[in-house]
A protein has these predicted regions:
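Bacterial N-terminal signal peptides
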Residues: 1-11
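Active-site rim/loop-helix segments in enzyme catalytic domains that contact anionic ligands
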Residues: 14-141, 163, 170-174
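Short, solvent-exposed loop/linker segments at beta-strand-coil boundaries, enriched for Pro/Gly
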Residues: 370-377
Length: 471
């Protein structure tokens, strides 16, 4: 007997996601600010989308929302899906919100088990130490200057999950700077942890001398709307929880109170430019793109990519964001995909690498391709054409699907390294072209401890258990 089981592999959804010029400029501005903020709460829809929109687009900070859960314990206004299926919906809604407000999205493995009054119950079910380690590693990877929580670390949060998320933010800010904690990752010092409070919690907040006030009024010419309106549009992505809101373009204000640390959030929230190597390269690239100097924009953005590779991994959010902008500036379509999904289990996972020139005024060359079973250099380098070049590659990498295919492009003296994550690219008559994570479909062989007769005309039941390869 052979049973089929879907096991999801690489969880990347879509390598090629074209940017508009304004989106590319906004992303360059974030790289150029040198500022990084981590927003922490418990569930999808807990985050303050208006604040994330302001931080990402007015302050130009690299702003990430860390949601401890995926929201599988909530209700569903728009369908019958609950539990894990609801968690999938809420995760997609959360990512849709980030695509509107300009933030990035991260999760931990914490399970949303529904409402909880007790923080002790939360830590028992979540596993305090494991979640703490996940959060510290996220902080050390993203290197935020400040952490902002949606909730206070006490009973005012109104939900055990909420309280726990604020407690965790403070604990992990301290531990992230401790070189003796988790020596596998480098320590990082957060300047402070602040609570994004409101008059809902404290009606006298406006008169509190310890509260930091932020005027979020303002219009973003690149995005064509106010920061409040952008945040409201992002908020309305949380459809299954019924969080659609009307757009408000009027004045907006936010308040913050310090929970831990010595950093001055008030001074930090004043927009300015970073002076480190990454920020300066991003600023130069943005200026060149703004005045129409495409070649200089490519050169500076490519140089920034080399700097990033010295400090982060190719699959990191930051490098993948850099890569998306790089493809826009080059005017190149680049993608690695399979044309069927799921795929039968190894020993081969055939895929197609496509490279196509979209901007005919620029000469971009393919210099090399590196896959698990192919390391191909081209001498001389091959000019990308408008018809596109296709190359068959094998994604098989020691029993798994490889994380990425490395492609080296060249434009004049600029060297561009792309790390393309494989996806399944499919088409449907109702929805058109779409992408999904590649799934592997292994065969499971079953042995019975007694003889089994088929087609006897009698009904019977066969019971079985499925175990993973590692037991």
């Amino acid at each position: 007997l052979v049973l089929l089981l879907l096991v999801f592999g690489n969880q990347s959804f879509g390598q090629f996601s074209p940017l508009t010029q304004s989106q590319a400029m906004a992303e360059m501005e974030r790289f150029g600010s040198g500022k990084r903020v981590l927003y922490m709460a418990a569930h999808p829809d807990d985050e303050n989308t208006r604040l994330i929109a302001w931080l990402s687009n007015a302050l130009d900070a690299e702003t990430t929302y860390l949601s401890l859960t995926r929201g599988s314990g909530g209700q569903n206004l728009i369908g019958d899906e609950l539990g894990a299926e609801l968690g999938v919906i809420r995760e997609h809604e959360l990512r849709a919100a980030r695509s509107v407000d300009g933030g990035n999205q991260r999760f931990t493995d914490a399970l949303d088990f529904g409402y909880s009054k007790s923080v002790d119950e939360v830590w028992t079910k979540w596993g305090h130490d494991d979640l703490q380690l996940q959060a510290v590693r996220t902080i050390r990877e993203l290197k935020p200057d400040f952490i902002i929580t949606r909730f206070p670390p006490d009973e005012r949060a109104g939900h055990g999950h909420h309280t726990a998320s604020a407690e965790l933010a403070i604990e992990c800010a301290v531990l992230a700077a401790d070189e003796k904690y988790d020596t596998a990752t480098a320590a990082w010092s957060v300047q402070g942890v602040w609570w994004n409070t409101s008059v809902w919690w404290d009606p006298t907040l406006k008169d509190d001398p310890e509260a930091v006030y932020l005027d979020m009024s303002g219009f973003d010419p690149l995005l064509g709307d106010t920061y409040g309106a952008i945040g409201d549009a992002a908020r309305s992505m949380h459809k299954c929880q019924g969080f659609g809101v009307p757009i408000n373009r009027g004045p907006r204000e936010e308040y913050f109170k310090k929970l831990w640390g010595e950093g001055d959030l008030s001074a930090y929230l004043m927009p300015d430019r970073g002076a480190d190597a990454q920020s300066l390269l991003a600023q130069d690239a943005a200026f060149a793109l703004e005045i129409g100097d495409q070649k200089q924009a490519i050169a500076k953005w490519a140089e920034l990519g080399q700097v990033l590779l010295e400090q982060t991994t190719p699959e990191s959010d930051k490098y993948q964001r850099w890569q998306q902008v790089m493809l826009h500036v080059l005017g190149v379509y680049a993608e690695v995909f399979t044309s069927s999904n799921p795929m039968p289990e190894g020993p081969s996972y055939p895929a197609t690498l496509v490279l196509q020139a979209l901007n005919f005024d620029l000469e971009v060359k393919l210099a090399s391709v590196k896959a698990p079973t192919k390391d191909m250099g081209l001498n001389p380098a091959q000019v990308l054409t408008s018809e596109g070049q296709e190359l068959e590659v094998d994604l098989y990498d020691e029993g798994k699907i490889t994380k990425y295919i490395r492609v080296r492009l060249e434009h004049e003296s600029a060297i561009i390294l792309l790390y393309l994550k494989p996806v399944a690219k499919l088409s449907d008559r109702a929805v058109g072209e779409y992408r999904e994570a590649i799934a592997v479909e292994p065969a499971i062989h079953a042995k019975f401890d007694q003889t089994v007769y088929w087609n006897t005309g009698k009904k019977g039941t066969i019971g079985y258990s499925i175990y993973s390869k590692d037991g």
